Structure formats: C-alpha cells, structure tokens
A protein has these predicted regions:
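Residues forming the flavin
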Residues: 1-196
C-alpha cells in the first residue's frame, strides 16, 4: 500500500491522458512484455526510468535493444523483494532469482506488469473447465458445460481481429436510423464519436 506502486499501464495512462509523470526515477517489475512497452513510452515522454527488473531469464532481443537505446538498466532473472519509504517509494530491494542476495535500487515509483489474464469468471460460473497455457502464463476456457464458445481475449487470443475491419452488415432498416455501438458499457455509438 505504499504510494507510488502501481500497474505500468496506469502510469502510462497518467502520462498519455493527463501529462503526469508518475516519478523521476521509475522502476518496472515485470514478468510480461507489455510492461516494457509501457516503460518505453514513458521514457520517450521524458520520464526517468531507473531500471527494468524482470523475473524471466530471457526476453525478446528487440526489447533489450530498445532498453539499451533508451539507456535503461535491465536486470533479468531478478525480483523485487521489498519496497522502502513511509509516505512514498524511496527505494526497492531486488535479488537475483538464483542466489537471493539482495541489493538496493533508489527510485521514487515502482510499476508492475504481470501480463494479461483472460476474464474467465463467467465461463467458470457456467461450470466450464479451465486449462493452463504455458505460452500465456494463464488459464483459458477449455471444455464447456453449456452451449458456449469463447473467442478473442477471453480465450487468450490477444491479437484476434487486430487490424480487421468489418463492413456494415446488411439490414432492412433505414441506414440513418441504425446504431453502431463502439462501446456498449458506456453507451457510445459511432455517431457520438463523429459528433465529438
């Protein structure tokens, strides 16, 4: 509950939406590539990145290259084992996952990125079984109990439909009276976006 510890995606949102830098010496604790991309975006926006700490023994070489290009220190096969600071982060303690010898890293914010997990709660409520996918590091729907099929992100397919555009479906209604929802939860239609 120390102020200054948050999800990397939240820190990126603060920077992109409000122009707020979450810190001057930020550390990322990651076990997933998405956090690296968040930190790269922050670094390009002028936020100081003290280090990337990743529990994995290896990551994509493109990530390492970009971190090097941006001057970001990377510690692979390491974990954050402690956060210091009473009213905010002042430092973290990290250790190598093999020898557990701790060392201190000064920072004023800690970002976390543990990856993405499919939302399987409704699937589980319908008594569908789950299976583990090592490539995702997550549980995904397996055998259904009801007549249900999961696709896209809820099935762990993060790129499903990336770049795809679906033409307007045929309808007998007057085209000017059709609602094309962009966001069901917030009741936003294509007309609302055009108007904005």
């Amino acid at each position: 509950d120390t102020p200054g510890v948050m999800l990397s995606s939240a820190a990126r949102s603060f920077a992109n939406r409000y122009g707020v830098a979450i810190g001057k010496a930020v550390v990322l604790m990651a076990s997933h590539d998405s956090g690296w991309h968040d930190v790269f975006a922050l670094a390009k926006a002028g936020v100081g990145i003290a280090a990337i700490i990743d529990v994995r023994e290896s990551v994509d070489s493109a990530l390492m290259h970009e971190a090097d290009r941006l001057g970001i220190t990377v510690r692979l096969n390491h974990s954050v084992i402690g956060v210091s600071g009473r009213h905010g982060v002042t430092s973290i303690k990290i250790c190598n996952n093999d020898d557990y010898l701790g060392r201190r890293v000064d920072c004023d914010a800690v970002l976390m990125a543990g990856g993405w997990t499919p939302s399987v709660h409704l699937w589980s409520h319908s008594k569908g079984s789950l299976k583990w996918r090592d490539d995702l590091g997550a549980y995904v729907p397996d055998v259904p109990n009801e007549n249900v099929q999961c696709v896209g992100a809820c099935a762990g397919d993060w790129d499903f439909g990336t770049g795809a555009v679906i033409d307007m479906l045929p309808t007998p209604k007057d085209q000017s009276r059709i609602k094309a929802f962009v966001d069901f939860q917030n009741d936003v239609t294509a007309k609302d976006i055009k108007l904005a």
